[in-house]
């Protein structure tokens, strides 16, 4: 199937997003170095293999946490990494390997053998067993090109000059994770805690299609130089993912490979962070904010998308109900098509709200329901009420609606009026180009 956009149009769209969302510099956490290489798995000499190394050996090395896909057909790298993480109890992790172009998913015993061989190659080089984790992304149902992977890994690991902890190295790593992405996703920030300790967070992610995680194809990594206990790190990451990567949808499909890792190198000389540390809630909030920014970049890069949409559900009885309503709206193909067509079809939004699988139906009371469009981009500050106290606005200002829906950014606000909890979910529209990209995916 041929694309509805010309190659020139696709390139122009990609260039625009690259200029808008890719940084030109950054700060990066101590205790890491990263490298990447083109093995030939991807076409045209594109980077397709990367390695993150923990270089600080405080109390045995980096602590680790992870959140994996809940898809029943878990990919071989997910299975292999879960086993290693369990053995290590989140301590002493030395490396993370990421490859793109082949997901190594639904590949049976051979796929698992190949995944284990990849990590063993790294562990042999480093001289440390059961300390390497793996991420893979690409076409499902195909085996890894082990000759290319093995040669690429050997070349990379034997070249110290290929590794660094600078902007160029991290940007190249994020490029090595890309498949249908139009731009690499890299964020870094530096924070100072109340006691005066300054630390750094860096996050990278990939994803543009098959995005509706419940921890799509979505991969991510967050690194920090703080010393954090494994249990505290898992608490931080799980909470952050639940409010970020688990609150995005491009197409409603959950991948076999979803993986988010977080490593804490401990290179900053400060007390170990645990759940009882005074700074723990603040660090947790800062990691969540970074994860949300990373997750939003995935949606902004949604395959064929023209709009970035925030679905804000507020005044629900509980967070779970707010989230399921926001997710149901975000996953609705009819809502997404209406957004692409710039059609203020609020009936589709109400329909989605009505079939949301709520844990407590008391969260939804038709008489207190309010739904509106809120301008975010050029229409910032504008609001269009679609439903007020359960009564539809039959005299919608179509001209105002058209102006708001023409923006690239939009917010849909659903006020349930039954409680105090809220949730933000991020989605995009569904275009002809999405179909073209995925119809041509393996060609």
Curated annotation (Swiss-Prot):
This protein may be expected to contain an N-terminal transit peptide but none has been predicted. Its EC number is 2.3.1.35, 2.3.1.1. The lineage of its organism: Eukaryota, Fungi, Dikarya, Ascomycota, Saccharomycotina. It catalyses: N(2)-acetyl-L-ornithine + L-glutamate = N-acetyl-L-glutamate + L-ornithine; L-glutamate + acetyl-CoA = N-acetyl-L-glutamate + CoA + H(+). It holds the Pfam family ArgJ. The record marks 137-138 as: Involved in the stabilization of negative charge on the oxyanion by the formation of the oxyanion hole. The keyword Zinc does not apply. GO terms for cellular component: mitochondrial matrix. Substrate binds at residues 179, 206, 217, 303, 438, 443. The record marks 216-217 as: Cleavage. HAMAP family: ArgJ. Catalyzes two activities which are involved in the cyclic version of arginine biosynthesis: the synthesis of acetylglutamate from glutamate and acetyl-CoA, and of ornithine by transacetylation between acetylornithine and glutamate. It is found in: Mitochondrion matrix. InterPro entries: Arg_biosynth_ArgJ (IPR002813), ArgJ-like_dom_sf (IPR016117), ArgJ_beta_C (IPR042195). One of its GO terms (molecular function) is glutamate N-acetyltransferase activity. It is an enzyme of class 2 (transferase). Heterodimer of an alpha and a beta chain. This is Arginine biosynthesis bifunctional protein ArgJ, mitochondrial. The keyword Transferase applies. Keywords: Acyltransferase, Amino-acid biosynthesis, Arginine biosynthesis, Autocatalytic cleavage, Mitochondrion, Multifunctional enzyme, Transferase. Belongs to the ArgJ family. The alpha and beta chains are autoproteolytically processed from a single precursor protein within the mitochondrion. It comes from Eremothecium gossypii (strain ATCC 10895 / CBS 109.51 / FGSC 9923 / NRRL Y-1056). GO terms for biological process: L-arginine biosynthetic process; ornithine biosynthetic process. Pathway: Amino-acid biosynthesis; L-arginine biosynthesis; L-ornithine and N-acetyl-L-glutamate from L-glutamate and N(2)-acetyl-L-ornithine (cyclic): step 1/1; Amino-acid biosynthesis; L-arginine biosynthesis; N(2)-acetyl-L-ornithine from L-glutamate: step 1/4. The active site is at 217 (nucleophile).
